[in-house]
Amino acid sequence: RGRIAIDARFDLHGHTQHSAHAALLRFIERARADGCRHVLIVTGRGGERGGVLKHSVPRWLQEPAFHRHVIAFHEAGPRHGGTGALYVVLRRPRG
């Protein structure tokens, strides 16, 4: 029914904002090099304020370091974490 398989998942729970940025970039680079096209990034929903990573990750994915690997991203469906996760579509690997 139009569902796309998730090739890889990355959970940012337990990361600080600083460590999450570096770890996410490494994950995205590795996933793309491995030929993954559709990945799931779990940010968590955060507390009452909505969570730092939940708001930071979409901004990061638009930075040049990430954008060179990322085609698009959007909020995950309920079965994959809903507002606490993102589907990310990666560019095809080079070569």
Regions found by a protein language model. Give the residues of each.
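Long, charged, low-complexity intrinsically disordered regions
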Residues: 1-38, 43-95
